[in-house]
């Protein structure tokens, strides 16, 4: 028993055992985890009295009264309790055994290799993305732009041919530019088409966390804490740990009061007034759908108005919830999109334009939903088919293909939510459709856990795997513990358990078999021991910024594959945890090494091979100065075989 809660538990236990008490009301959170907390307390207290279940999503006085007027029979909740206990115990058994197995087999003294059903597949998402970025080979391309003029009007177009607007050769782009320069364009297509954009759905916790990260840079945990305070202490929003983005029909009658509360915020007052003046709120299945509400409905404001004296984080989160709640009742944003094709000397140019007919819900988001004003197509002048427009200007622009971006916290939350798409089996993919990796309530803690154990680093809004995290995923290989498929199979069976078609004993028996195989798998694997993240200024996880490769690669046991010959002594160069180094360092003391992180950029095996073979790489992007500014440079070996940066303007 936790010392901090022992006294409180004694009070609860005493009340449960009081002869005057004939029934116990379970008022824990309405959901799987709330059911679990109550079950543990009930069993620990040795209580056997009948249980009634309070099932509510708001802590306002009115909501609590309504909940007590419709208490559920606790016996109906037994399947939910079984599923909750099974999930909790299975996670504990798998995590404890897998962590110990891999820590003993591959960890160094004092360095635990934490492994878990949710955190490990999440880490693999980031490591796989990092590998994609490292293996990506940028390719240059060229695009031709033209400006067309007629009287006082102009518009711009981009060259295209068969849906392709990029040219792989500069000479070809310049030839097209020269061909159309000074020519006259004829409009062969001028099509106008009306389009609309529906308002975004109400918030569940994951979407709220993603939006707060994109707009304010909040971590998922920071958003959850603010939302929890708004729910528990301020009573301004409904239950935040929800996975639903819809409301139930029985809530429709009370929505106007919530509009009044949301509209009490000065910046939202005009929008609240507009909805109230219209009379009846427009209700659609994008707002109210009983089939898409399970334990809890979407996060919305309560009917309590804010006093206006909220802490900064809570103020921002409350604004997000209130703004989204009002936005769903506004009409679609409507546009008139224009597509124009202009032909010049057998070459075609595409132009797109847009006119906003009705901002609709977008009026609540003048700076965009994510806090960044989206670049809209320009308003084109009047253009008709058959018109001739002079080519006033032609330009050739060079571009380069870009690797997939690293995960921001917002993007990772989205990937965890939709992790089922990485599962090949259709039935299992469907089982994960409404769950993903973790739950809305636990995803923030999973990310923080990955950081605290040294698997991830947070660089502003970006999450980057450490060497330790990469090493673990490499060791695990195709183990089921690193795949979302394990969660898919669990969720499929736990859902059946909630409905009485799966037994808890069968599920836990299979978990035991799985754990035994997992431990045997760890014992049979071969690989190097994993070092803890490097320390700098007393902190773990700091990245090396050195370009000098003279420090040697003796920090780790080398892997067997040779990347090339050591330029100092001719021995094979192999990869270690932190460097590509001479394999003969122990015998001969050769200290040649190419560090895997140089000025904030990871050096891939392919780049190390190029450096060994040619003495330099091509220009590479992704380096960072001490001030955090990105720059490009090549890596080269100097006369003493040390790695240094070479810039374009160097001789």
Q: Which role fits each region the language model picked out?
A:
Residues 563, 579, 587:
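Residues immediately within or flanking Cys/His clusters that coordinate Zn2+
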Residues 588-614, 645:
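Short metal-binding segments enriched for Cys and/or His
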Residues 566-569, 582:
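Short cysteine-rich clusters marking metal-coordination/redox-active sites
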């Amino acid at each position: 028993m936790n010392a901090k809660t022992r006294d409180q538990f004694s009070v609860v236990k005493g009340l449960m055992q009081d002869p005057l008490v004939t029934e116990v009301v379970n008022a824990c959170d309405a959901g799987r985890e709330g059911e679990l907390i109550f079950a543990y307390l009930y069993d620990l207290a040795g209580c056997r009295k009948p249980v009634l279940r309070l099932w509510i999503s708001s802590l306002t006085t009115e909501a609590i009264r309504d909940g007590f007027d419709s208490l559920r029979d606790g016996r109906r909740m037994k399947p939910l309790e079984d599923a909750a206990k099974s999930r909790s115990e299975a996670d504990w058994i798998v995590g404890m055994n897998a962590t110990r197995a891999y820590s003993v087999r591959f960890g160094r003294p004092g360095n635990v290799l934490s492994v878990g059903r949710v955190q490990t597949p999440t880490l693999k998402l980031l490591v796989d993305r990092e590998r994609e970025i490292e293996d990506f080979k940028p390719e240059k391309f060229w695009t031709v732009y033209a400006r067309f003029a007629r009287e006082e009007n102009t518009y711009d177009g981009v060259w295209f041919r068969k849906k392709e607007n990029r040219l792989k050769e500069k000479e070809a782009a310049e030839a097209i530019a020269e061909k159309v320069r000074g020519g006259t364009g004829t409009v062969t297509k001028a099509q106008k088409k009306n389009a609309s954009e529906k308002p975004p759905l109400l918030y569940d916790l994951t979407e709220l966390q993603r939006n707060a990260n994109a707009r304010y840079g909040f971590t998922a945990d920071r958003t959850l804490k603010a939302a929890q305070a708004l729910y528990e202490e301020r009573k301004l929003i409904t239950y935040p740990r929800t996975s639903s983005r819809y409301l139930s029909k029985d809530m429709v009658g009370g929505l106007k009061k919530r509009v009044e509360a949301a509209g009490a915020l000065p910046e939202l007052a005009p929008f609240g007034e507009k909805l109230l003046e219209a009379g009846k709120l427009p209700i659609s299945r994008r707002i109210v759908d009983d089939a898409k509400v399970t334990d809890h409905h979407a996060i919305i404001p309560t009917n309590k108005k804010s006093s206006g004296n909220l802490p900064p984080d809570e103020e921002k989160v409350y604004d997000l919830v209130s703004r989204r709640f009002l936005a769903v009742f506004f009409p679609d944003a409507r546009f008139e999109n224009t597509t124009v094709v202009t032909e010049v000397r057998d070459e075609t140019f595409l132009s797109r334009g847009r006119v906003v007919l009705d901002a609709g819900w977008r009026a609540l988001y003048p700076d965009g939903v994510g806090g960044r004003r989206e670049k809209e197509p320009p308003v084109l002048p009047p253009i008709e088919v058959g018109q001739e427009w002079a080519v006033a200007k032609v330009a050739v622009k060079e571009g380069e293909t870009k690797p997939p971006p690293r995960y921001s916290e917002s993007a990772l939350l989205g990937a965890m939510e939709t992790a089922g798409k990485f599962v090949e089996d259709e039935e299992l993919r469907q089982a994960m459709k409404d769950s993903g990796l973790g739950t809305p309530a636990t995803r923030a803690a999973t990310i923080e856990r990955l950081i605290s154990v040294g698997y991830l680093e947070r660089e502003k809004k970006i999450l980057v795997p450490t060497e330790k995290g990469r090493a673990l995923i490499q060791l695990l290989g195709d183990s089921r513990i690193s795949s979302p498929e394990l969660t898919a199979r669990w969720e499929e069976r736990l859902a059946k358990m909630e409905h009485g078609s799966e037994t808890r004993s069968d599920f836990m028996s299979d978990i035991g078999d799985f754990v035994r195989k997992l431990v045997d798998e760890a014992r049979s694997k071969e690989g190097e021991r994993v070092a803890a993240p490097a320390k700098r200024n007393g902190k773990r996880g700091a990245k090396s910024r050195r370009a000098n490769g003279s420090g040697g690669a003796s920090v780790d046991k080398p892997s067997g594959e040779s990347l090339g010959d050591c330029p100092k002594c001719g021995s094979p160069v192999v990869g270690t945890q932190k460097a590509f180094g001479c394999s003969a360092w122990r015998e001969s003391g050769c200290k040649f090494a190419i560090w895997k992180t140089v000025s904030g950029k990871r050096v891939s095996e392919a780049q190390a091979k190029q450096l060994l073979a040619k003495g330099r790489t091509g220009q590479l992007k992704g380096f960072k100065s001490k001030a955090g500014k990105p720059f490009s440079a090549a890596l080269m070996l100097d006369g003493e075989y040390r790695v240094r940066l070479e810039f374009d303007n160097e001789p």
